[in-house]
């Protein structure tokens, strides 16, 4: 790895010590995904310092109208933006009236963040002294299930290190999100419904222009010292957010553990209503519980590594780097869905846009051919075949006829959507890359 603060380790990315100047970088490096959804490694708790919030759904995009000083023949009408989706990870902690916020805390000790590539787990732990003097120990574990790709899970533990304290836990969803990367500062999302029932909450939203109908959901369980269930004292509903508030009194050594299950469901993937789909998924998640879901997820990663691992002896940084590449490829694209492809930044952020570049055929397909069942590479080629008519339309815009096809430089649905005209039409090798992949 070329980030000097990342500790060399054969199977993990490890960061030790809290430095606010590294937060955004680490949010990218420690990102997680399961092909259907992904997220930057944002903190679950409130953070008032510089951060780049990002959660994403595979294949969901917005056609952001092109912004140029002059128009040229064949110039794409829009750039397909990867959408920052409603966030489901929020677990805000308040102790004796003081927010848990690493940016304003009096002291932060023993901060450690680890991305376990072998098991697909994102772990974080630290001790903190809040501005009001309260001392806490925090441990969090998070993953997006490879075994059930509509389910993500968080285990978040707060231990009081001394004294006594009243604690509040706010578990919530937030659809008041925006893309930092926007040509015209358009609203990409429209929230259509906000609801909460018992320990479950959900927000229905759809994208403007492309009309992807989605639901973001959560189910929360809170326990005091693993045994006593803490029930929500209040349901919080707003136009763009919904959640539950939990309260407890702690003495020194007590631990409050929050289990949170969340994720996204697209209407095109279900036959009934989105609300019915939420309660079906929540039922599966809560019935299984965090540990069983984690085990199934780790087993799915084990099956991947059994076929895809590359061992480099004598250079731990090189070993770490190649496994990071393998990890990112597999959490970006699993091969289950022929409507998805391999975005250039995976689920690390919204910049660069687009879902599909020629890199898929030139560089990625050989990897999947060597490490996956053949249907995975076949699905990537099926994706291009399904967009052949759009490639013919694209060629026609440039004066070609008789069935000539020019595949786009960048696309989400088969239409060209790269905003740089010169790059779009100089990089004509993309047809050759696709032909090369078919040959292979």
Please state what every model-predicted region is.
Residues 2-323:
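Beta-sandwich/jelly-roll carbohydrate-recognition scaffolds of carbohydrate-active enzymes
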Residues 39, 293-440:
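Substrate-binding groove/exosite segments of carbohydrate-active enzymes
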């Amino acid at each position: 790895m070329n980030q000097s603060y990342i500790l060399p380790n054969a199977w993990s990315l490890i960061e030790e010590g809290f430095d606010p100047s590294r937060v955004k970088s680490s949010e990218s490096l420690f990102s997680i995904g399961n092909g259907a959804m992904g997220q930057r490694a944002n903190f679950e708790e409130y953070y008032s310092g510089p951060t780049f919030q990002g959660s994403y759904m595979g294949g969901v995009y917005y056609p952001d109208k092109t912004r140029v000083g002059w128009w040229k023949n064949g110039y794409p009408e829009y750039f397909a933006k990867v959408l920052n989706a409603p966030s489901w990870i929020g677990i805000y902690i308040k102790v004796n009236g003081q927010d848990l916020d690493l940016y304003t805390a009096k002291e932060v000790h023993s901060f450690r963040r680890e991305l376990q590539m072998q098991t697909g787990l994102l772990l974080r732990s630290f001790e903190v002294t809040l501005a009001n003097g309260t001392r806490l120990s925090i441990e969090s574990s998070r993953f997006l299930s490879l075994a059930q790709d509509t389910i993500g899970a968080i285990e978040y533990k707060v231990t009081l290190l001394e004294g006594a304290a009243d604690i509040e836990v706010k578990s919530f969803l937030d659809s008041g999100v925006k893309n930092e990367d926007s040509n015209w500062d358009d609203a990409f999302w429209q929230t259509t419904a906000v609801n909460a029932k018992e320990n479950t909450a959900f927000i229905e939203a759809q994208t403007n222009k492309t009309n992807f109908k989605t639901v973001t959901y959560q189910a929360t369980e809170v326990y005091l010292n693993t045994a006593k269930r803490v029930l929500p004292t209040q349901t919080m509903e707003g136009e763009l957010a919904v959640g539950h508030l939990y309260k407890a009194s702690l003495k020194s050594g007590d631990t409050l553990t929050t289990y949170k299950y969340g994720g996204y469901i697209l209407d095109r993937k279900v036959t009934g209503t989105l609300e019915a789909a939420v309660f079906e998924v929540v039922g599966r998640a809560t019935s299984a519980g965090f540990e069983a879901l984690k085990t199934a997820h780790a087993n799915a990663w084990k099956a991947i590594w059994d076929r895809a691992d590359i061992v480099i002896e004598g250079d731990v940084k090189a070993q770490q780097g190649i496994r990071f590449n393998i990890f990112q490829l597999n959490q970006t694209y699993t091969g289950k869905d022929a409507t998805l492809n391999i975005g250039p930044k995976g689920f690390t952020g919204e910049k660069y846009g687009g879902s599909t570049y020629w890199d898929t055929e030139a560089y990625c397909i050989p990897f999947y051919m060597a490490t996956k069942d053949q249907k995975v590479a076949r699905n990537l080629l099926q994706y291009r075949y399904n967009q052949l008519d759009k490639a013919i339309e694209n060629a026609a815009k440039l004066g070609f006829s008789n069935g000539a096809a020019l595949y786009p430089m960048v696309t989400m649905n088969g239409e060209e959507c790269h905003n740089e005209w010169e790059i779009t039409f100089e990089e004509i090798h993309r047809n050759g890359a696709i032909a090369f992949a078919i040959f292979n």
